[in-house]
UniProtKB/Swiss-Prot annotation:
SUPFAM superfamilies associated with the record: Scorpion toxin-like
Protein name: Toxin To8
Comment on protein domains: Has the structural arrangement of an alpha-helix connected to antiparallel beta-sheets by disulfide bonds (CS-alpha/beta).
Keywords attached to this entry: Amidation, Disulfide bond, Ion channel impairing toxin, Neurotoxin, Secreted, Signal, Toxin, Voltage-gated sodium channel impairing toxin
Entries under PROSITE patterns matching the protein: LCN_CSAB
UniProt modified residues of type Cysteine amide: C82
Organism: Tityus obscurus (Amazonian scorpion)
Amino acid sequence: MTRFVLFISCFFLIGMVVECKEGYLLGSRGCKMNCLTRPEKFCELECSLVGGENGYCAYWLACYCYNVPESVKLWESDTNECGKRK
């Protein structure tokens, strides 16, 4: 029983360490990266260029990426700078 509990604990610990983030790619002006008029595989390519595992054009509007390294800045509603003057 002790080994089973230890195994489960290690399993959850590994899951937390390997976890990567996901979200919308950040464009040059602080907005989500637009994909409306881009080729079909544009978002998949852009996500792989920043180290993401996969990506797609969400609702034909913005690139959404999965398993992006922690060092990559993604668009966040809390820190949204899109359309704001500096």
